[in-house]
């Protein structure tokens, strides 16, 4: 029995070695098991492995040790079962004594009884989740303390020498087996070379003439599997300028000839006899083959000069070319109707028409016979419902879980008001469209005629298009009058001040606390800093630490939740620090690194620091880490919380500062091991908070009425109004301006200033300027003004109680922006804005009951309401597999984690056990979404990585095209030049390649109405991605004009976004059957292909697909077999079951008369 268990253990280890390192050698497996027997501890086993096999991965050795121990435990449990049955009485006595001891220990514990019960409840809930979702609680393979060095006793020197001798013997045996294996492989390859499976381009074959026609002869090729015939055109038989009257003058039937393959298209092969010496078989025109190879190599080397010289992929690439040539050739053929084809036959028979003059004649192939083509069958696919091993039963358990809630009371007054405002917003859009249609109808009919004329005179259609574009876009592009008044003729940049930088720094609330702050940092390893917006904590703390000498031990890192904030803050600190940006003070954001070896203070996004944790979990390059704006609770910030807690335990000298603008002090302090709080007192004054008596149905109208009442009846002081988004703010500004204008000139001036993230930072600076005497300003802003902006002079705040929040739907796997009530903490933060300059008032446009009963205590963190695919992939790459027990401040919902794991599994990043694959490891190295990473890596195998690099870079930027108001028709004409029938991705590729051919010139961009800044940004992103691909030896190959490869690569990453044309209207997604539509700006708008893939969905008046690409449905099953499968032809698919059969209209019978149940 022991021998059988030993054999099973050896086979298990062999399988793991084969899976991870590609060599399942039995001797190596026995050696590893022997080391595990000699070293019962994991640290000793890892050390023994590293000494004997230097390049052996530590994570693999830990995995093998756990596997061996697990197998050993199985054997010990089976042998001990009998002993347990015989010793029940003894075990009972031991249990009694153990229970007594445990009770005594518990009584002597310092923990409170309530804390003990709470811990017990949490452990029970965790155990329940573990049982329901075992795939989310996989043990972490790599422990953090495995890297510590363990001293080896002197007594083990003999053992070490024996192990080395064994290893040397194994190495010699392994090398011998590898030589024998290579010899066998070489012999098999030589045998395979004798007969080719497919014809090879430019190779010379022997053949026999099978038939002779007027335009050439057909030759049956030898040396290829199966029967293959090719055409030698009459022009390819004799070299020189000798003209043949008929091929029978040179060749005879059954004659042996030597031919060279010129091209392979579908099943048609084009051959040449004149390029081959018929006696010796020598290639008389080798230059053609050489030039094609040189051009291919030059293209690849130009794209990536550092790529490895790997010739093993040639055969696979050739096969891909053959398959794609079939698709391209069949697509480009011109089909002739059967009556026309009969007429052509009659003309040829009468001698009026020659064969080369036929429309379906090809110089290389000859006549293309469309009769051979069969009509395409209706290809139906459906979702693959097979669950991986690590997610077995999770879908059933997910149905029992409650959905993600971002609203406390879905039927409350606040939620009803949000729904009403959404309906009113749609009404405003419809009213705008109606105005546009009325303007279109007002155009003279005679000017519209050239637009409908298929063959207009030169210039007529251009004039009509200009008029139509002015009518169609004039409402949208014309600058409203309120904007003209607000912006004025002169714009001042920045907050006007006459004080020096030193005086500005000393005027901040944090300056008097400088010494106390440094003292607190030196005494505590972790510090939670609470300070309101404008206290100076972001710009000053890092400088205080650098001045105190913390920058000599390592960098001072400061994270920001937004890229714009990281760049702007670093510029300000560099100015105060007295250095050039990028030297002592720098910043790092995605695809942009503005630092140097001299950098002391480094500002970065929280995502950048998370990626640095992937490479160095200890963050050894930093002496201090500042997590700024932690109250915003982004996904990366929440993950960094848990990682930094672990890093603090491993590095006692590391200092971590958590800053927040809200007073969630107890929560942060409790999570960070009762960390010390450092509070920066702000300039706060009392605020009078007022509620409405009844709920407001239209909060936008109520807000504007409140603004006018304050302006007409309250003392001087500026107003701050919170709304949800750009569209709502613009509508409010327009309505408010018209209402104030209708009051006449006797009313004091009201300056209307909008603020939202889409506005340039230079345009937002007007809100900081004081209003002129005798006037008042109203700032209408999103929740960006809650904490990120400090506006002086605000005495009145109007809070409708809503904001836009990103919410993830695990059912369809998409994020969406929804209008939802704010939290109580956000409401307090908004009211606090009125007490910065003096005593103020806050008008809450909801009832006090709604504040207490319908608002959550604090905002839901982003990690609990958004997609976690990228986050889970990063954590898996760090070795964190136990996601349920990871130390999150607020754990994400289980259904969101399961959805992320399913997505990564379908992309091939996870295996059947939920562990990271080699593909997943590569995907984690790219700073991209998992779909884009998979698309980029798959393009290497498909032979189109050069083009996909460009597509990914162009997708990362926005607003490539622009349409100036006065030249909209010309801009549309220029844009149409770049259109590709395959879709928007190829259109973006065409734009970049055209810009590249113009030597990246700015005049070309201006001429073609393309944003030069966006293209330069895409160029920088592309260079960064090329650097990562070079680092991991990924080839950069160009597909040329073969767009099928590019479409396949896009499909390999975004297969979940596939949609099929709906017979009634628009499209329906394959995953959920959701109705979607192609965006009007798309290349494929009004073309309506049957199958498409989209990059993202945008919700305006409809669910629009943006960046759309056509696909072949067969690719979905081929490239994503874990996600899609072909429907069973013997059964009705789920999609067809949902379709309703509508009979043809029959005025004499009932519509349901055809049903068997209705028949008599």
From Swiss-Prot:
Annotated localization: Nucleus
Q: Where is the composition biased (Polar residues)?
A: 412-424
Please give the GO cellular component terms listed in this UniProt entry: catalytic step 2 spliceosome; spliceosomal complex
Which UniProt keywords are listed?
Answer: ATP-binding, Helicase, Hydrolase, mRNA processing, mRNA splicing, Nucleotide-binding, Nucleus, Spliceosome
- List each copy of the Helicase C-terminal domain by range: 699-879
* Domain Helicase ATP-binding as annotated: residue spans: 518-681
Q: Where is this motif: DEAH box?
A: 628-631
Mind listing the GO molecular function terms for this protein?
ATP binding; ATP hydrolysis activity; RNA binding; RNA helicase activity
Cite the record's Low complexity compositional bias ranges: 76-110, 122-132, 294-320
Gene3D superfamilies (UniProt xref): 1.20.120.1080, Nucleic acid-binding proteins (2.40.50.140), P-loop containing nucleotide triphosphate hydrolases (3.40.50.300)
Stretches the record annotates as Disordered: 75-140, 153-192, 294-334, 409-438
- Catalytic activity as recorded in UniProt: ATP + H2O = ADP + phosphate + H(+)
Give residues annotated as binding ATP.
531-538
Q: What is its EC number?
A: 3.6.4.13
Name where it mostly resides.
nucleus
Question: Where in the sequence does UniProt note compositional bias of the Basic and acidic residues kind?
Answer: 155-192, 425-438
Q: Which residues form the S1 motif domain?
A: 202-274
Q: What class of enzyme is it?
A: hydrolase
- How does the annotation summarize its subunit structure? Identified in the spliceosome complex.
Q: What does this protein do?
A: Facilitates nuclear export of spliced mRNA by releasing the RNA from the spliceosome.
Stated family: Belongs to the DEAD box helicase family. DEAH subfamily. DDX8/PRP22 sub-subfamily.
Quote the protein name from its UniProt record: ATP-dependent RNA helicase dhx8
Organism the protein comes from: Dictyostelium discoideum (Social amoeba)
């Amino acid at each position: 029995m022991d021998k059988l268990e030993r054999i099973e253990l050896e086979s298990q280890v062999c399988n793991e070695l084969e899976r991870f390192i590609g060599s399942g050698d039995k001797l190596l497996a026995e050696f590893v098991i022997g080391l595990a027997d000699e070293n019962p501890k994991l640290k000793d086993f890892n050390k023994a492995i590293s000494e004997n096999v230097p390049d052996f991965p530590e994570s693999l050795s830990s995995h093998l040790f756990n596997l061996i121990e697990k197998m050993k435990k199985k054997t010990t449990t089976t042998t001990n079962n009998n002993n347990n049955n015989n010793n029940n009485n003894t075990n009972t006595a031991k249990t009694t004594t153990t229970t007594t001891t445990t009770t005594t220990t518990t009584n002597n514990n310092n923990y409170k009884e309530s804390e003990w019960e709470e811990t017990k409840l949490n452990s029970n809930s965790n155990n329940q989740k573990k049982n329901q979702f075992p795939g989310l609680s996989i043990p972490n393979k790599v422990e953090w303390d495995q890297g510590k060095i363990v001293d080896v006793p002197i007594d083990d020197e003999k053992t070490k020498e024996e192990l080395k001798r064994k290893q040397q013997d194994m190495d010699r045996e392994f090398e011998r087996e590898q030589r024998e294996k290579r010899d066998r492989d070489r012999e098999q390859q030589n045998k395979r070379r004798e007969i080719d499976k497919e014809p090879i381009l430019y190779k010379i074959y022997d053949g026999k003439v099978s038939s002779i026609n007027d335009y050439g002869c057909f030759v049956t090729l030898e040396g290829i599997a199966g029967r293959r015939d090719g055409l030698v055109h009459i022009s390819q038989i004799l070299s020189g300028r000798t003209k043949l009257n008929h091929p029978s003058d040179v060749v005879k039937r059954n004659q042996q000839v030597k031919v060279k393959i010129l091209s392979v298209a579908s099943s048609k092969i084009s051959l040449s006899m004149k390029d081959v010496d018929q006696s010796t078989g020598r290639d008389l025109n080798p230059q053609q083959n050489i030039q094609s190879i040189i051009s291919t190599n030059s293209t690849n080397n130009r794209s990536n000069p550092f790529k490895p010289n790997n010739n093993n992929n040639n055969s696979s690439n050739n096969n891909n070319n053959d398959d794609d040539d079939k698709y391209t050739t069949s697509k480009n053929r011109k089909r002739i109707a059967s009556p026309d084809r009969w007429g052509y036959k009659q003309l040829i028979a009468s001698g009026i028409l020659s064969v080369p003059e036929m429309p379906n004649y090809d110089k290389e192939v000859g006549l293309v016979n469309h009769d051979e083509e069969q009509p395409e069958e209706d290809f139906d696919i459906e979702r693959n419902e097979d669950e991986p091993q690590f997610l077995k039963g999770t879908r059933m358990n997910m149905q029992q879980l409650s959905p993600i809630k971002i609203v406390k009371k879905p039927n409350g007054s606040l939620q009803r008001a949000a729904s009403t405002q959404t309906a009113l917003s749609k009404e405003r859009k419809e009213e705008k469209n109606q105005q546009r249609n009325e303007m279109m109808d007002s155009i003279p009919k005679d000017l519209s005629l050239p637009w409908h004329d298929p063959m207009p005179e030169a210039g007529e259609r251009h004039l009509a298009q200009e008029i139509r574009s002015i009518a169609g876009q004039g409402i949208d592009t014309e600058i409203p009058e309120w904007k003209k008044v607000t912006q004025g003729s002169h714009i001042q940049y920045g907050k006007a001040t006459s004080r020096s930088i030193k005086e500005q720094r000393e005027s901040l609330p944090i300056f008097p606390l400088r010494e106390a702050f440094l003292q607190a940092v030196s005494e505590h390893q972790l510090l939670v800093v609470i300070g309101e917006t404008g206290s100076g904590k972001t710009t000053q703390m890092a400088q205080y630490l650098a001045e105190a000498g913390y920058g000599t031990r390592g960098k001072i890192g400061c994270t920001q939740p937004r890229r714009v904030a990281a760049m702007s803050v670093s510029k300000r600190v560099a100015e105060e620090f007295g250095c050039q940006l990028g030297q002592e003070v720098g910043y790092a954001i995605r695809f942009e690194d503005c630092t140097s070896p001299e950098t002391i203070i480094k500002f970065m996004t929280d995502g950048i620091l998370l990626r640095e944790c992937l490479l160095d979990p200890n963050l050894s390059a930093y002496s201090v880490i500042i997590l700024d704006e932690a109250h915003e609770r982004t996904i990366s910030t929440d993950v960094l919380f848990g990682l930094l807690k672990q890093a603090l335990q491993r590095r006692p000298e590391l200092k971590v500062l958590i800053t927040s603008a809200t007073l969630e002090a107890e929560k942060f302090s409790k999570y960070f091991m009762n960390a010390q709080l450092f509070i920066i007192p702000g300039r706060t004054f009392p605020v009078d908070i007022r509620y409405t008596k009844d709920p407001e149905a239209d909060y936008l109208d109520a807000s504007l009425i409140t603004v006018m009442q304050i302006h007409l009846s309250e003392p001087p002081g500026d107003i701050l109004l919170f709304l949800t988004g750009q569209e709502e703010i613009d509508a409010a500004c327009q309505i408010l301006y018209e209402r104030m204008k209708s009051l006449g000139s006797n009313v004091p001036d009201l300056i209307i200033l909008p603020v939202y993230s889409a506005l340039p930072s230079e345009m937002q600076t007007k809100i900081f300027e004081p209003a002129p005497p005798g006037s008042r300003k109203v700032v209408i802003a999103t929740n960006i003004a809650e904490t990120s902006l400090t506006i002086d002079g605000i005495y009145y705040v109007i809070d409708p109680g809503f904001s836009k929040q990103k919410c993830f739907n695990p059912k369809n796997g998409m994020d969406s922006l929804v209008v939802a009530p704010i939290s109580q903490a956000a409401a307090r933060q908004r009211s606090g804005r009125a007490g910065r300059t003096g005593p103020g008032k806050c008008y809450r446009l909801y009832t006090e009951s709604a504040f207490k009963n319908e608002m959550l205590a604090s905002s839901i963190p982003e990690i609990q309401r958004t997609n976690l695919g990228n986050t889970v992939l990063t954590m898996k790459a760090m070795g964190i597999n136990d996601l349920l027990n990871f130390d999150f401040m607020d754990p994400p919902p289980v259904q969101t984690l399961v959805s992320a794991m399913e997505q990564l599994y379908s992309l091939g990043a996870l295996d059947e056990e939920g562990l990271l694959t080699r593909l997943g490891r590569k995907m984690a190295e790219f700073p991209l979404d998992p779909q884009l990473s998979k698309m980029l890596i798959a393009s290497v195998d498909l032979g189109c990585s050069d083009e996909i690099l460009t597509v990914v870079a162009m997708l990362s930027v926005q607003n490539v095209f622009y349409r100036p108001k006065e030249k909209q028709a010309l801009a549309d004409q220029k844009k149409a030049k770049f259109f590709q029938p395959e879709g928007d991705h190829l259109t973006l590729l065409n734009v970049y390649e055209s810009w590249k051919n113009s030597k990246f010139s700015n005049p070309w961009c201006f001429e073609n109405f393309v944003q030069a800044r966006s293209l330069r940004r895409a160029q920088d992103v592309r260079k960064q991605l090329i650097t990562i691909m070079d680092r991991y030896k990924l080839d950069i190959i160009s597909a040329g004009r073969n767009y099928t490869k590019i479409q396949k690569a896009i499909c390999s990453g975004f297969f979940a976004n596939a949609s099929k044309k709906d017979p009634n209207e628009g499209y329906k997604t394959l995953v959920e059957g959701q109705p979607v539509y192609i965006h009007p700006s798309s290349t494929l708008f009004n073309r309506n292909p049957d199958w498409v893939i989209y990059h993202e969905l945008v919700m305006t008046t409809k669910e629009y697909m943006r960046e759309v690409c056509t696909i072949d449905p067969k690719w979905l099953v081929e490239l994503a077999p874990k996600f899609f499968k072909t429907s069973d032809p013997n059964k009705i698919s789920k999609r067809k079951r949902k379709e309703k059969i509508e009979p043809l209209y029959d005025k004499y019978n009932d519509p349901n008369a055809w049903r068997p149940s209705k028949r008599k």
